[in-house]
């Protein structure tokens, strides 16, 4: 169900704190026509392009990404199953806009969780959101609370949800960056991409409806409605539009080893001079993807077999130990930038390092940066064992013993006692000496010699 994506060779700033902005180094700005836009390296989380990424904006039906996330989370936890059948209630169908996106699900109609997810993500059916919300949390209101709790858990700081479907409300907003965080979490579930990357699907007949043929609202992956935006590299994810939100799109694309996630919010729908109607969310997303693919590539900037530093060693007859990177480091860089342009900053855990040293022991880190922006960080490991000298270790231990505060205090006390003892001997020794001399004189004065008869 849930794919755990471990990054073994990519060590970008996403592993340090927050995210990094890849230096554009004289790249031409794509000037994306949207209120907010974001292009992120899907493998590492490094930001390739950003425009107003933290601005609070209306997401429209991009909201449904969070609804899908919470539904799939409930499936993983065993609270629901994809083949579980749900009955559409009157409460789930009430209060929805008559001209909003819909799969025409009727009250009392029975449909599986999986097919409701298809209705929600493929044709953006608003009623499917509320049906799933009731199944997951018991009520739409409780589900909205769960949406906001999940947003906080994911680190979203500019998001507040009011409903599960994205129908307009002035208090229902998010940001391009927060949508990226939500989408990234949803992509951990294989079923999410399987469903949202569906161009068209036939939903089997239900108790109240004939079979439904659904065609996606995402023109990047299906040209059934408009072929002008098809992108063979694109996969999913979700469209959204209202008069207040404009046209919005979250999408992903992969070409070779490159993989991007994009978010555009607040795009317009333009009528060109030749009468062509251009939906800018699709058009600008394609421009953003092409800009990323054309201008960036992965480059190996550090290899595990290089030895960038010798570290002094104490307590050993061996004076130095070499260190090497823990692994190769491959990062996304502008094509005009090379590994030699990066600044290497080596920080050692100790210099000198005390023996014994074990091969593979971490002795420091190396940070790679450009123009003050961090690209990557990699651990530096000892390349060989270094044995400790018994004699040098013994003298070190002796010094450490006498450097201990308790030993120093005891030493001072002993020194004071010795001084006091010497003073005592000096003072009382003189008194005894004087006393002895005075007694001797007295005896000598009373002696008159032997009497002779």
Predicted feature locations:
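C-terminal non-catalytic accessory extensions
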Residues: 443-446
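Domain-terminus/edge residues, biased toward the C-terminal soluble/receptor-binding domains
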Residues: 156-160, 170-173, 177-437, 449-452
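Active-site-adjacent loops and short helices of periplasmic peptidoglycan-processing enzymes
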Residues: 24-177, 181-190, 195
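Sec-dependent N-terminal signal peptides of Gram-positive bacterial secreted proteins and lipoproteins
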Residues: 4-25, 413-425
